Amino acid sequence: MKKYTLLRTFMLFIAALILCGWFSIHTQAAITKGVKAPEQTVCFEPDTTSVLKNPLTGWVMYLGRAWDENFWQTQRYDAMPVNGGDSTVRVSDYAGTCYIRINWNMLESKEGKYVWNDPDSRIYKLLASVRERGMRLAFRINVDSRDQGQNTPLYVKEAGAKGFQDPNNSQIWSPYPDDAVFQQKYEKFLQAFAVAFDDPDKVDFIDAYGLGKWGEAHGVKYNDY
């Protein structure tokens, strides 16, 4: 008898839920039936003057790798003359990305010491000045030292990496890209770089060059090729 009472109570409860659901649906339908949404006209005025800073589009500004954070004033990027010098503009109001071709040695001259972690370093301040103006960064990291300076940190050579001297300057050394020690050290650096800069709010792109003269894949020299 007790089991029958519990079952009957349960069935009544389910029926009540179904009835409440039906009533709710039909009540809502009755309320909204015949109610016409007010007409609304939306007009858009074309913007033909503003520069849209979308990823991978728009103006890209090249950044001198020897510059410091004051270049905005010294190079007049905060007050660039236009219209024959009658007026000035801030370049950062138009360019959305700041691209710098930098080298590994400038970012990690000593193993494990990354300039982006040092607020007192020139590179840290330079990159920070870009971000302060609402621009994203873009990078190429050169490792071949020919025709430039010491682009790969010498700790890589001291660790046993094989390489070659610049024919025009015996004091300048470059690693062979297929050398195992170079690859090990460079991979470690790139992993640390990715942790710091794998952020689309900070970085627009990082190009995949870096080998060869000027990081443009010209005259790449291998050890076993």
State the predicted function of each range.
Residues 1-2, 32-35, 206:
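Generic cytosolic/nucleocytoplasmic N-terminal low-complexity/intrinsically disordered segments
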Residues 2-11:
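Bacterial N-terminal signal peptides that target proteins for export
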Residues 6, 22-24, 45:
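Residue-level detector of bioactive/disordered segments in secreted/extracellular proteins
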Residues 11-22:
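Bacterial N-terminal signal peptides
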Residues 21-31:
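Sec-dependent signal peptide cleavage junction
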Residues 28-29, 223-225:
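Short, intrinsically disordered, charge-balanced linker/junction segments flanking boundaries
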Residues 31-181:
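N-terminal substrate-binding region of glycoside hydrolase catalytic domains
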